[in-house]
Amino acid sequence: MMWKTQPRSKSSNNIAYYREGSGTSILFIHGVGLRLESWNAQLKYLKDHFDVIAIDLPGHGESDHQTSSNKNIDSYTRMIKSFTDEIIQKKFIITGHSLGALIAIDYAIKYKNDCNGIVALNCVFQRSDGEMKALKKRLNNIASVNHEKEIDATTKRWFGDNNSEYG
């Protein structure tokens, strides 16, 4: 699947993002190994009714890598807090998929006064040791992965072969 690459701006902490529309703000956070284009279908339909903001997590898409070797949910949450304080500057709905869902939940708990609502999609819970090992391997290989091929495989797994309407 080919997706439409969205134009990006960058925050002062080098998080790449796409923003369009007006009204209530919705922040979209993707999962491991993906990029903001994984939200293209949602952005396409919601931008006419909302202020949609999708980010590339640090180390993904066009965002810079985290400088800290301590890459965990808390460090991502703190970076996103800095981003929302600078870029959104008002209450918003936070939406995340997979890793993004974990970050969204952590953000909503820590900064509940920033959020009008939360959507957590495909959030993981109690991974086995084998699943954690596979996830860590995937995280360590992100820099060398062909992201388009990775997104194609993920999209095919979710939606089947005929998924052109989702990009």
What spans do the regions from the language model cover?
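Alpha/beta-hydrolase fold catalytic core
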Residues: 1-26, 47-51, 85-90, 156
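Active-site loop/oxyanion-hole signature of alpha/beta-hydrolase fold enzymes
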Residues: 12-18, 44, 53-95, 110
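Active-site glycine-rich loops that stabilize anionic/oxyanionic intermediates
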Residues: 23, 31-35, 98
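Serine-hydrolase catalytic-loop signature spanning alpha/beta hydrolases and amidase-signature enzymes
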Residues: 31-41, 52
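Alpha/beta-hydrolase active-site loop signature
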Residues: 33, 57-61, 125
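Conserved hydrolase catalytic core segment
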Residues: 89-129
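Conserved alpha/beta-hydrolase catalytic His-Asp/Glu region
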Residues: 126-134, 144-167
